[in-house]
């Protein structure tokens, strides 16, 4: 059992907690959030506009959050260095505020905890994606990143294609659901003028670092991919559009067969597969990192193909945070 503390009880923090309860093997013993009081935590965890009402029991009692009869310590510290993770046995910390995303900033948690998993991309922390590069993890790392939801969708698919056919180069578009940092009505956004426009009635072109992060996770693809995103007015579930030039010619049926085989073997539970005529809401609550849509892709010639993969950018990503915690704890214990 991995004892975990969660810093930041926003979208990802709450859904990581839900996943931990579903999967088992990860015991959330403490939550820190200076901006949400205990009674409001109960409400926010119980009700969710996308993923529905929490079906278990939850209440506030004696200054603790009681979930399924189990007490969880609650802290309200703004400085991670002041969170007493050690006093409650939280050995591993999920840093899900979106603020402390570098090694230097996230290391403040190490005054109480033993290891930090950042639920966001990091400029300098080692980045790991389940099904892609976990074997490169070293227990000496104290702060690591679970990358982004888009990277978790893209890289398993890219790895399968690259290993089987070779990727010469490629372009990525991600059509991405709304996130909390976007504006509901037009407002100031000095660094990203388009990002200041209302998400409710616009398709908003934006940047994505996912293509660059692929190169960190799969070094042989470094510099071979680049991309952009479009933010769209949906609440959850996004889709990656990957266009690649292949080293080895292959017809679309061969490519589909390779992905289907991986989804049933090496990447089972990470890379899903569907041949149904699906739309985005069909994947709300999906725990796969990436679901390849075999009927949505197209091919121009044997070396040039467009591949489509869906992902629940909240739930699927949060499940990988839990999986990464379990993997890391197992490897640390094997030392």
Swiss-Prot record:
It comes from the Eukaryota. It catalyses: D-glyceraldehyde 3-phosphate + phosphate + NAD(+) = (2R)-3-phospho-glyceroyl phosphate + NADH + H(+). SMART domains: Gp_dh_N. Keywords: Cytoplasm, Glycolysis, NAD, Oxidoreductase, Stress response. It holds the Pfam family Gp_dh_N. InterPro entries: GlycerAld/Erythrose_P_DH, GlycerAld_3-P_DH_cat, GlycerAld_3-P_DH_NAD(P)-bd, Glyceraldehyde-3-P_DH_1, NAD(P)-bd_dom_sf. It is found in: Cytoplasm. The record marks 176 as: Activates thiol group during catalysis. NAD(+) binds at residues 11-12, 33, 78, 313. Belongs to the glyceraldehyde-3-phosphate dehydrogenase family. Homotetramer. This is Glyceraldehyde-3-phosphate dehydrogenase.
